[in-house]
From Swiss-Prot:
It comes from Radianthus crispa (Leathery sea anemone). Gene3D superfamilies: Anthopleurin-A. Inhibits voltage-gated sodium channels (Nav). Keywords: Disulfide bond, Hydroxylation, Ion channel impairing toxin, Nematocyst, Neurotoxin, Secreted, Toxin, Voltage-gated sodium channel impairing toxin. The modification Hydroxyproline is found at P3. This is Delta-stichotoxin-Hcr3a.
Length: 47
């Protein structure tokens, strides 16, 4: 999947590890949304 930034990754500066994965729609079962950003068509999710 496409990596995305979770709140726990810290501020989005170059070089940070992106620990989330973008899911279209909402997060897969067993995953949870890991940031506070509001996106219309996808969520940044983490297992």
């Amino acid at each position: 999947g496409v990596p995305c930034r979770c709140d726990s990754d810290g501020p989005s500066v170059h070089g940070n590890t992106l620990s989330g994965t973008i899911w279209v729609g909402s997060c897969e079962t067993g995953w949870h949304k890991c940031n506070t950003e509001h996106n219309l068509f996808h969520e940044c999710c983490k297992q």
